[in-house]
Amino acid sequence: MRNRFKLPEHLTMGNFVSAGGAHASGTKDGGNDSGLAAYVASLIDRTLDWNDIKWLRTICGSMKIVVKGVMTAEDAAESVRQGVDGIWVSNHGARQLDTTPATIEVLPEVVAAVSGRCEIYLDGGICRGTDVFKALALGAKAVFIGRPVLWGLAHSVSKGLTVLLSSLH
């Protein structure tokens, strides 16, 4: 949002239309940015802490609890101490954070910190089968992909998805 991005007047951001106001068009009055970053930040509960995992456990019964977004050994160790069933190494696409490390780079330290006490999953930066192989070899139990699937579908629907999945084989 640093570049004061603004959609053309005839376009809207469909995911924000129900929120009303200027956020649907990606604009706001005043300030040096589009206002979208502030709007999205206002949706995040900053009071969340490690104690919330204990609370989740009380209402989830036998449902597995997986913490997503773990990128450090310290957070991995604390996740295990809190009793999670799995850790999902993810930088949430890193497209908004230009200094976030790649998930494959932090995976070995997360695996070492966990020492087999829970399962570890990974997403981010997975574009071909060798990426999947590396993540599994470094200790991930499973690897997830997101954006490449959407790219394949957007490019040529089922044929694009078939090509993408073939490249992961």
Name these PLM-found stretches.
Residues T12, F16-S25, L43, E105-L122, ...:
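Alpha/beta catalytic cores of nucleotide-metabolism and tRNA/nucleoside-modifying enzymes
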Residues A37, N91-P101, L150-A154:
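Glycine-rich, proline-tolerant flexible connector loops at the mouths of alpha/beta enzymes
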Residues L48-K54, T58, P101-V114:
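Short loop-to-alpha-helix "cap/lid" segments that border enzyme active sites
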Residues M1-R81, G93-Q96:
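Active-site entrance/lid segments in N-terminal catalytic domains of soluble metabolic enzymes
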Residues K68-V70, V89-H92, D123, I145-G146:
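Generic beta-strand/beta-sheet core signal
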Residues T47, V66-A73, T100, C118-V132:
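Glycine-rich beta-to-alpha transition loops that act as phosphate-gripper elements at the mouths
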Residues I59-M63, V80-A94, V114-R117, G139-V143:
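Glycine-enriched alpha-helix->loop->beta-strand junction motifs that scaffold or abut catalytic
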